[in-house]
Amino acid sequence: MKPTRFLFTLGVAAWGCAILAAQTAPKSPTPKAPPPKAAAPAVPAVGTAPATATDQNAVVKRYCVGCHNDKMKTGGLSLEKFDANHASADAEVGEAMIRKLQAGLMPPPGGPRPAPDVHAALVKALETDIDTAAGAKPHPGARVFQRLNRPEYANAIKDLLLLDVDAGDWLPLDQKSANFDNIADAQALSPTLLESYLNAAAAISRMAIGDRNAVPVDSTYTNAGYVSQHPWDHIDGTPFGTRGGMVVNHVFPADGEYVFEVTLQSGANARFEDVDISIDDARVSLLEYETQPAGGADGRGAVHIKTDPIFVRAGQKSVAAAFVKKAEGPYEDLIRPHDWSYAGGGSGGPGITTLPHLRDVIIKGPYHVTGLSETPSRAKIFSCRPTLQAEERPCAKQIAAKLGAEAYRRPLANDEIDRLLPFFDDGAKKGGFEVGVRTMVEAILASPHFIFRLEREPAETVNAKAGAYRVSDVDLASRLSFFLWGEPPDQELLALATQNKLSAPGMIEKQAKRMLADPRAEALSTRFAAQWLRLQDVDKVHPDPNFYPNFDDNLAADMRRETELFFNSIVREDRSALDLFRADYTFANERLARHYGIPGVSGNQFRKVQYPDDTRRGLLGQGAILVQTSLANRTSPVLRGKWVMEVLMGTPPPPPPPDVPVLDDTADNQGGRMLTTRERMEIHRKNPTCNACHRFMDPIGLALDNFDVTGKWRQRENGQPLDTRGDFYDGSKVSTPHELLDALMKRPEPLLRMFTENLFAYALGRRAEYFDQPTIRAITKAAAASDYKMSSFIMGVIKSDAFQMKSYQPTSSQ
């Protein structure tokens, strides 16, 4: 192993061992001493206790203990010994009750239920006692550490070195907890993961500074088969007057000559094409593609064409390869008269042409290296330029201080700067000043201070081994920035933090408003909302093309983007969080609007559009939600009902008992007639074991059954009229999406609480525990004053004790 590499490995391994030891500590110990008083207490004021404690215990005994007793323990819960007068004594059980009662799920329909005022009084009594105890002794919770996940790592590199990288080239897939990839308890460490960070540091430092000794390599970029190649589709980033193709960000390591090769796939009768190769929007070559025999030039259906050597200067550049448009105007695809995007790969038969598919772009080089031109990355790194050998080490020290402070998200102490200089010395001995700086940059990127978000505990808290404390302004800046932007703090935020001004009254709110107005706040939609709403699950469903020929991965991507833009608009315009469920508009391009039956939308650009009727509203009318809760060949009211209960309401049904047959085992026809999904479900629900949960889920899912597998509106299934009638668990009749929305809006508290809980967990990088529920309730109740504006929830999380404070976290002695 090389000496420098050994130092990297040794340093990171030592930190890794310390953090691994810390991971064995209890997740969130209750602090033994009360913390300093928070500037904005995150627990509600004490309310008036409803009725008497004896009355509340009588309600629990009459309506709950019959099932939730020591013998039956329905749902794993016994309330025989639970005292509603002192719910805070067993807050975990109390919170479980509140969640079910507030949603109206308990007592279950069909059995005796208390009067609405009695039901509400019980919920309020439980909340009041738990919230009162929490107000007397706040528990901000704790986490051991967080490390940068893939998106955060890529954003940090972009800010630090002005490079767009795909962190997935080096880092393994992020594990999720509570459906988020930034939750600390899922961010396990391993030697393989640490090695991945080291490999990333080595590669990225070389990309940023360049390499005068670069040797020719082949870099291959592959275009997914579903990417559109149709004559009417223009790919963003490609020149105007082109169609299809692909765009890649490629780092050219040095000034020199490069060869660009493209791989095309098509049938035997593909038409002649011209392929435009451009760098940063400037054409550098025009390649001619000619029809090939069946099987392609390489016998595997592929044709390879390449440019002559082209001189390119060092740095990251946008490389585009696209087909030149042959004509303008309407087209008709006779091969696949649907919305499929990929017509190449097979012969259309005599007299019919097919469209080729641009599969790969291969960049080869550099050849005949002539030097290194100035790049944005080099300009950022080299804040000084020594002219004498004696100036090299002082210059390296200046670079270490400046770059290190930005990478570590805090100022560096002198001894920390001094510890980076041996890496410069080692590299400079081998290759001069620039190699020394590159080696030092590699050390910075491999440092635990860059990879991990480590928060320092005050000495008095460590010595006392107990209590809670306010996090430093520097750590608070990182919490705020990674929450709202998904990336490190910018210069303004970091400057305030290093001067200890961020915690001044009103300052964090002022900064949060500034950051929410910044385009980078879109991370709340692409990162938070996308994970909360399980948008990644859309890719797990592949509607059967025999039944749904108009659906493809392009449309799936449009649906995901629709939901992201929709959520972002609510944040940006500071609308009510209830608009997530009741909005009468969405964002669509021409294809998605056509799929939904919305007229008057042309072009590939997304824009805000009004729904023409009330069949669609909010999230439950959007394709990304409807597709992910379907199966390949039919809708699934069960999955849709379960999704609403779990994701939106926070009351997931229990898993099915073992050995219970699935719905697909139920006969799909009867008397020579195909059964509808509802008819098969009714047969399935005759099993009492199944009915216990399906009576909650099924009416929700059936109310959405007018949306087919792809989210398209329909009136019939298997030739039979749809029957979507059902009874919501509060007794409301629901048979349409609009009636389901009305039923949900009658009791919006579970929806708002679950939204707050997910926002809270994402912001803090840890699961929301039972002791966090008073804070979550306080945020939700406070938001009511503004009609639940989105900013009220975001500011409520930011101002909470849980966000600004931390409980002491003991490390393991092992």
PLM regions and their residue ranges:
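Active-site-proximal, well-structured secondary-structure segments within enzyme catalytic domains
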Residues: N223-S228, D233, A557
